[in-house]
Amino acid sequence: MKKILTSLAVVTTLASTLSADFARVEMGAGVWGQTPSGYATRTDGDGFLNLDGTYRSSENNSQEMYAWVLIKHPIPIVPNLRLEYVSVYDEGLTTGDVNGIGVTDSPTSLDTKQYDIIPYYNILDNTFWTTIDLGLDIKIIQSHTIVDAVDTTGLGGIAVDTTIYDSTDTTVVPLLYARARVQVPMTGFGAETDVKVISDGTNTLYDIRAKVDYTFDIFPIVQPALEVGYRVQQLTVDDGDTQVDLNYAGLYAGLMLRF
């Protein structure tokens, strides 16, 4: 009987280990301290901001929320799933012609919400403490742009701080996705990086993160964790009429739960 109980205990432990390895849910949320920089120029009076002129970032730091969920399952062929959300914010000045109104150094805000739907496959799944994922990121970008007038000079009697442009747009962009993670054996420490990128050589969008995290193995079902990292987003466009060079970078930190 003792041997049977011992064998059952071993089998149960192995089954739990395999289940944890092949079906897993992780989630996290925190704050990204972004420092934006760059500019956007439009020269044909159409498209970005309906602008014939230039927007320049004021490079003011902003604390924005992010969240993510990772769902891994044991079903072959069907990809795993990662969902992400992040808010990106910038304030700057616009000079040029906006909606037919001449402006100089008009306060402008770019408020962007990004939603990432990422189906992916495990190339390595904690093999020798190493994980590699490859997939496709479907990035949904919802941008809200506001341009305010600063005075009435040349504006046809428009009052101070009147909004002269207010627009919301949604864009869907596919990107390649890759993630690599290394777990330090016999500890709760891990390090990982992920890259989302699309480029045709002239126009480029990428989103790169690198982080370390620590998992507290104190509960049998759910394990809390902390993560700290650095994130960079870069958008570069040069198609003749439009030139864009916008960058968001900074440290982020958050809480995680592993199931």
Q: Where are the regions that the model predicts?
A:
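Outer-membrane beta-barrel translocator/channel fold
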Residues: 223-259
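Transmembrane beta-strands of outer-membrane beta-barrel pores
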Residues: 31-35, 85-91, 123, 138-144, ...
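Residues on the lipid-exposed face of transmembrane beta-strands in outer-membrane beta-barrel proteins
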Residues: 29, 67-73, 117-121, 136-138, ...
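Short loop/turn motifs that connect adjacent beta-strands in outer-membrane beta-barrel proteins
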Residues: 19-23, 74-79, 124-131, 184-189, ...
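Residues that define the transmembrane beta-barrel architecture of outer-membrane proteins
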Residues: 23, 61-65, 111-115, 130, ...
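Flexible, solvent-exposed loop segments that connect beta-strands
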Residues: 37-57, 89-110, 142-169, 201, ...
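Cleavable N-terminal export/targeting peptides
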Residues: 1-24
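Short glycine/proline- and aromatic-enriched beta-strand/turn motifs that initiate or cap beta-hairpins
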Residues: 19-87
